[in-house]
Amino acid sequence: LSDVVTEAKADGENYILNGYKSVVMNGPSANKIIISARTSNSQLDENGITLFIVDSDSNGLAKTNYKTVDGRRASDLTLENVSVSKDNIIGSLDSGFEILDSAIDKAILAISAEAVGAMEVLYKTTVEYTKTREQFGTSIGKFQVLQHRMVDMFMEYEQCKSLLYMATMKHEEGAPDAKKAISGLKYQVGKAGKFIGQQAVQLHGGMGVTD
C-alpha cells in the first residue's frame, strides 16, 4: 500500500498530480475517482500519502479502458499535471495510508463473503447434478471416487466460511490479530475457490464447459 509513486505537489489552493493508477474497477463509468498520491516523504514510507477525489473528466487525466477476466470493466489511468482542489482531499493531508489500510481490510472481507457464497452454489449445484447424470446405468453421484471429491469441495467451503466468520468478528472487535486472520482468509479463499471451481467444471463433464 505504501509503494506510491504518483506525486501531488502543492500549487496555491490546489495540488498538481502526476503519475499512474492501474486496475480501476468500473473506471469507464465512474464520474469521480479516488487517487492516492505522495505529498511528502519517500516512495515506500507509510506516512506522506494523501487521498484525492478527482473528476474523471479532469484535464490531463487519460483512461485506457478494458474488460476484466470476470466480465467487468476497468481502467488504467495516466495523470499529467492534473489540478485538484485542496477541498477534494479525503481526511487530512498525509493520512491516506490509514484510510486505505482500513478500507482494504473491509474490502477483503466483503469480496471473500461473495466468494464463499459462490463456492456454496458451486458445491450444491454439483451435488445435485451428479444425482441426475447417469453413466453405466446409475447416477454418477453414487461413484465413490466422485463422492470423495465432493466431500473435499464441502470441506474447503466450510473451512472458508468458518474463517470468514472468525476474521469478520475479529475485525469488528478490533482484535490485535485481526489482520492475521484477514490475511489467512484471503489466502484460503483464493486457494479453495480455485479448487472448488475446477472440481465443479470437471464433475459437470461436458456441461461444465458449455455456455
Q: Where do the protein language model's features map onto the residues?
A:
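A gly/ser-rich beta-alpha-beta helix-loop segment of oxidoreductase catalytic cores
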Residues: 1-10
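Flexible, small-/acidic-enriched active-site or ligand-binding loops
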Residues: 3, 55-91
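Short, structured patches in soluble enzyme cores that scaffold and shape functional sites
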Residues: 10, 21, 37-39, 53-56, ...
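Alpha-helical interface subdomain recognition
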Residues: 10-16, 76, 97-211
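Short beta-strand micro-motifs in enzyme catalytic cores
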Residues: 15, 33, 50, 73-78
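A short core secondary-structure module
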Residues: 18-62
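Short alpha-helix boundary/capping segments
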Residues: 25, 44, 67-71, 104-114
